[in-house]
Each structure stands twice: as C-alpha cells, then as structure tokens.
Amino acid sequence: MSAQLRAAAAITPAARRVISGPAAVRRFHHYHHLPTGGIQRVEIAARGLRRSVQFPALANAYHNNAVIVRNASFTRLLPKLALKFIRVPALFGGMMLGAVGWVQYQAIKVSNSAQEFYGNIKATVADTAFSVWSSAVDIAEQTKRGWENTKNQFEIPEWLDRIMKGEGLAGEGSGSGEGGPNGGPEPPRQSRAGAATVAGASATVYGYGASDNDDRTPEEIMRDDNMMFITKKMIEIRNLLQKVGQGSTVTLPSIVVIGSQSSGKSSVLEAIVGHEFLPKGSNMITRRPIELTLVNDPEAKVDYGEFPDLGLARVTDFSLIQKTLTELNQSVPESECVTDDPIRLTIHSPNIPDLSLIDLPGYIQVAGENQPRELKRKITELCDKYIRGPNIILAISAADTDLANSTALQASRRVDPRGERTIGVITKMDLVEPEKGAAILSDRQYPLKLGYVGVISKLPPQSGLFRRDTGNLLASINRNEKNYFGSHPTEFGPDSGVSTGVMTLRKKLLQVLEQQMSSKLNETTEAIQRELEETTYQFKVQYNEQPMSAESYLAASLDDFKHQFHEFASSFGRPQLQTLLKDALDQKVLDQLAARYWNRPIEDLSPAPREPDNIIDLPKADPDSPYWHRQLDTACSGLTRLGVGRLAATVAASAIQQHVEKLLDKSSFAKHPSARKVISDAAATVLADRSYATSDGIEISLKPYKFDPDIQPNEWAQGREHVVGVLQAELEQCQAAMKALENSVGGRKKLKEVMSFVDKARKGEIIVEGDHPSGAGGFSAALLARGREAVFLRDRADILSLRIQAAKSRQCKTLTNKYYCPEVFLDAVATKLAQTAVLFLNVEMLNDFYVRFPREVEAKLHEHMHAGGGLEKFAREDPKVRRHLDLIRRKELLETVLGKIEELHRISSGTAGTLGLRGAGDLKKRIGAPSSSGRRSFF
C-alpha cells in the first residue's frame, strides 16, 4: 500500500465520525472499478487529498481524537503528482498524433488508387471508342462498295426501289403541289435508312453487331432478308390456320423441341430468344406444351411477351413471364402431371428471328416417388402427338451422353426414320474433349439430313459480388461460344465441316422452317380452297348468305326487346295498376274483418267460452251498440294506417318486374343468362330509385282519409256490389281447403268423425283434459289437429255465407247502416284509397319507368358487353348464333389466308429478279410460282 493510500485510510475514520454527527450535511460514496495502473492510483490519491483539506470540521476532529498521521508529507507527494499529471496528457497527445498520421496515410493511398483507376478507365474508354469508330467507318465503306457492286450486277425491282426512295407509302409523291425549286412537283424524298438498312435487316438476327464484320455478300444479305420476310408471312398464315380450327387437314409446320430433362433443352430455347424466361427447378416443371411464337419487330423499343389466351399484353419483365409460366404449369394436378392443353406465348423483339417453336415436357427414364407410374407413357404420347409430320423436330442431346441412349433421337427415328425433318442439337460441348465433340457433330452412325449443331447454351457460373446481366444473354453466350470454338480451330473451324453456335442454329432453324413451310404451301393452298368452297356452300344453304356479327346480333335482340316493351307499355297503365292495388287492399280488408268479426280460433279441445257479441247476431244488434261501433272504427283505422303508400309502390314495382321477366322469357335474351340478369337488374334499379318518393307522396295524399274516409252513396253502392264477389271468392277458398283436408285424412267420413268429436268436446259433452301427444277419443294428435282445422273452416264458411246474404239484403242498401255492413264500408274505403294512390303511381313511378328503363338497359348492356370480351361471349351463348358466327369467321379467315398467299406470291415474284436466275427458280419452286404455261401451280 502506497503512502497516499495509507494517508487516506488514516483520515477516513475521523471523517466518518464527523460526518455521522448532527452537523453532517452530505455523505460521499466513492466506487473504484478496474484499477488500471498509475493513472487510476493518481486519481485516488488526489481524491483522498481533497477530502483531507476540504472540510473544516476535520481540524476539530484531529484535536479531539489525537490521531497522529505520520506519512502525510506533501513534499514527497506533490512532485510525483505533478510528474504523473504531465505523463497523462503526453500519452493522449502521442496517441492522437499517431491516429492523425495513420488517417493521412490511408487518405493518400486511396487518392493514389482513385487516380490510377480513373486513368485506366479513361484509357480503356478512349481505346474502345476509337476501335468502335474505326470499325464503323470500315463497315460503312465496305457496305457502300458492296452495294455499288450489287447495283451494277443486279436489277433492283420497282417495289424495292420505291422503298429506298421513300415512295413506298400510299399518298406520298403523287401530289400536284408546288414544292419543287421551280414551282413544279416536289422531287421524291430519299430514304434516310438507305441501302444499308434494307440490306442489313437480318444482321441483328444473325448476330452481326457494330463491331463484327458481316462477311455475307450482298446477294446473301438480300436472300436472308427475303427469307425472313417470307417466314414472317408464313407464320402469320399458320396462326390464321390455327384459328380456323382445321389442324388435321390444313396446317403448316412448326419446330417441336424435344429432349430429356437433363439435356439442356430449356437453355437452348432461352439462348435462341436471348432471355431467361422458362421455369427452372430440379423436378419436372414443364407440364403443358408451350407454343412459342417469336416475332421479329424492328419497331419494338424493348423486348416483351404476350399471353393471348390470358389477355396479358406487353409484359417487358421476363421474370414475370417465367413466374406466369410456372404458375400455369403448376395448375396441372399432381395426379395428372401432364396435359395437352397448350400455353401460348408470343415474344416480340428486334433481335430474334420469326420462328414458331413448341416446347414439350422432357423425357424421363423413371417416374419419381410422388409421380404416377404412367407419367413416362403420358410424356411419350404427348411428344409423339406433336412430332408428327409436317412439324420440324429439334432433337436436343447432351454431348456428355452417348447418342445411342438419346431419347430425343430415338423418338425422332420412330416418326422420321430418314431424318429429313430432324435437326440434332448437341449441348454442353465444353464438357467433352474437342475431338470427341467434333466426332459427335460429324456422326455417321445416326445421320440426319439437316445435320447437327453444337452449342454451349448455358454460361459458366460467374463468381464475385456482381451477377451477370441477363438482359444481354445472347451476346454473352455468343461471346462464350466464340471463345471456346475459336480456341479449337482444327475441330470447329470453318474448314472442319461442322456447325457450331447458337447463331448458326438460329439461321438453320429459320432456313429449315421457311423451306418446310414453302414446300407445304401448295398442298395447304389446295386444302384451303376446298375448305373455302365447302364453307361458302354451307353458308349459302344454311343461312342464305345472311351476314351476322356479335354487334348486329345484340342490336337485333335489343330492338326486338324494345318493341315488345313498347307494346307492354301501351297496354299497362293506370287502370291495370288500380286493379292490382285494389286486389291487394281487398286482402287487407279480409284480414281486418277476420281479426275483428270472423275469427273463432280453436286452440284445444276445452269447452268454448260464450261470446256476448256474435257476428251472427249483428243484423239484430242495437244500432248504437258501442261494441260494434268500436269494431268498425278500429278496422277502418287499421286499413287506412297500414302503410298504403309502401304497399302501392311494392305492388306496382312487383307487377312491372314480373312483366319485364315475361318479356325476357319471350325474347332472345332468354338464352343469355348474363344479359338477362343485366336487364332485370336495370329494371329493379329504376323501380327502386322511385319507390321511396312514390310511397311518400301517396302517404301525404291519403292523410285526410285517415281521419274521415268521406264515403259517398255511389261509392257505397259500388262497394256493396264488389264485396259480394270478394266474399264469394273467400268462401270458395274455404271450401277448397276443406276438400284438401278430406283427402289428407282418408275421406269425408273419417273427417266428419273427427269433427264430431271436436264439436262434442267444445260443447262440453266430452271432457278432454289437456292436449295429449297420444291423442284422445281413439284419434291421434295429428288427426285431432286436422279436425280442429276442419271445424274452423266450416265455421268460417258458415259466417261467409251469412255475410254474403247480409250484403245482398235491404239492410246494407244505404250508407246509414254501415255498422251493420262492415264489409261494404271497408271495401268502399279500400276503393277510395286505391283510386287516390294510383294517381301518384302512374305519374311518379310508371311513366318515369317507361322513359328511363330503355336508356338504362342500353347503358348497362354496353358496360357489360365491353368488359372482358362480353360481346363475343354473349353472342356465342346461343348455339344457333354460335354456329352462324363460326361459319362466317371460318369463311373470312380462309379468304384472308388465300389473300396472304396471293400477296406472298406477288412479293416473291418481285424479289426473284434480285436473287439471280438460280435463286429465283428456287424461290418460285418453294412458294408455288406460276408455271411456264402462265397458270399458278396451286390455283
């Protein structure tokens, strides 16, 4: 323990005693953590020194306690403290200087690296720009010289010359304006693109970029452009033929892609397209055929895809296309695994050729644990369905597997034993030795007339923090293939006799598809002509050449419905409304009479209590009887205050809605549930809009009658005559109900026995205690319930008969005896209410409905028909109309196909002269040019 700490320890007891006394004002607590050496000890000594000199009370403590402190020597303590206080700032200062020096060193190092990096980038960009500019100048000069030679050697057709001069558009260059320098016609404007654009239309498709040398001759460039154009037209014709629906007799070939799951089939398709868009996964992903149509669209700014069957257009995100394809494939149940329902996808891009491809599920050797056993057979049957002629087979095989075990080649051999329409594609060429790869491509054991093409369609995995740009997939694959195949010129060079590269595959596919389509065009044209003749004949015989479209059918149906509605409006007016409302009020009158006068319910078999005032005694009752006065006043008040306004609006709306439904049943909309619902909802909407206002107006107009009905003598006479018929109808209903009860219990005799037992019990002749579930008197509980109901109906019928006689009697002839004839009075009140209410109904609801309903129907139908193809769906709901529309559509499509074939022939005839004698002959032969006799071969 140092001297400082011992001094502090000696002072502490005295200080503690002083602080604990009454004069103590505060207590100091000191905590020392982590003694780290001299610095901490210096601070502790300083705090001990401050405690010893800070409080004056310590002086008294020294005298009172006689404590001797020997080692409290300031002469030794102060120099050490000063030395340590100087050492601490020096230590921190040294650390600060070191940190500043290190930061400065790192800053200088980063600055030098940035300058070096910037210099490298600057030099690289300058070199690249100079190289690109030099290459562009060389290409432009070479193209210019080649085009000049081509113009001297070949005669340019008129249509091509017009395009090059900017005269190809209709209406241009034919005006008589004074735009020329001398006031004459303005000379034709030259095309900005020039010959280079026309001649290089296929350059991007075949992979010739700005930095590549297009080694094709002008003749080859022209031939390739024509081939692309013809293929585009052929694919358009093929798509039209698919819409015709005659795939068995009228068809053009497509390219069917087959291969095992591990052969790299998806990678080849993505390399051809230039985007990753197919589903990925270790398990089988492709469960439905994918009919892929590639469209070369020079006007497209970005690549995009379309799903015509789903209504998805211009999907520029290919990851979304991949997700959509995955979901469509996963929609197939696991138990089914594969289906022949195709997924149609169209991809537009300026960098792809016009091709028609079909991607099929990959072949498997053994079904998985969660897959059905017949999966292998289903996949084989599905592939066999598509690889039949005239489709072109793209058989994908991996280079690291023996061709003898290639499932794709085995399948193609079954349907194409001579290999005339099969292209072999060998993937993963970089996984085998170059000599072995070249031997596979030049294979003679499994020869194909269209040959083999070796590709490296999948890029090697890239390490590092940055992922490769998938948007430029084709360029990356092309660069990778050139590096690999170029490093082995002996095996894969121009003189090796083998075909390699995705670009070569794209060109071969385009050539083969064009040749196959052209070779089938004659046969297709003849089949189309036969189909068109048959369709025209059926159209004339069945429909008398009457044109029809979905729009015309809807218009005709709507006109017919409107005509029927106008006939209904002219026959349904105020008299009909008053009759309906009076019938509804008659039922309310009967309800009031039954509640106040007629009801004699039989709840059980106990004796009936005696009634002092019976309806049977009403004709002889005192004319000033308060009971009968109160009964009539209560019934009248209940009738006028039951809500006649709402009742009238409801009755009118229900009647109109029912008539609209009847009109729909008779119209052509009866065969169209969705359109019928739209019209019915439109009627309900119009009626509901006016219901509240109409009922409110009726209640206001009927308010005086709630206090004084003010019945006139003529109204009394009409009510007396009308109520007899109402009571007679009620009596007939009671008799019909009694007849139904007789049939339900087994006859009139049985019912009379039960009724007799009930009458005796009600008179007290038979004592029945309670209503036992087992019955009484030998009758079951259900039979006794029927008996009580029959007694009630009998008593009601007797009362109705008496009241009919009373209404016809002299007593009910005048209004002064209204208390003796409540039926007549209430009927007269109901007639007055109906006459007043129908005035508002006719103006506020009926007339408004007749005006608004036709407009509402047109608006709602227009909205419904133009939502999601509703118009076409509406027309095709009628089987007869659907057959009519299908026949017309079929006829129009066949005519369009023949027109496109004729256009294709005219264009090919115009371009044949630029291809030389041999090329012209080949082109005419492929697409059916006119024969030497002047008659076209396929016409």
UniProtKB/Swiss-Prot annotation:
Residues 815-909 form the GED domain. GTP binds at residues 262, 264-267, 281, 428, 430, 457. Mg(2+) binds at residues 266, 286, 359. It catalyses: GTP + H2O = GDP + phosphate + H(+). SMART domains: DYNc (SM00053). Residues 710-809 are annotated as: Paddle region. Residues 427-430 are annotated as: G4 motif. GO terms for biological process: receptor internalization. Disulfide bonds join 812-821. It holds the Pfam family Dynamin_M. Oligomeric complex consisting of membrane-bound and soluble forms of MGM1. This is Dynamin-like GTPase MGM1, mitochondrial. The gene is MGM1.
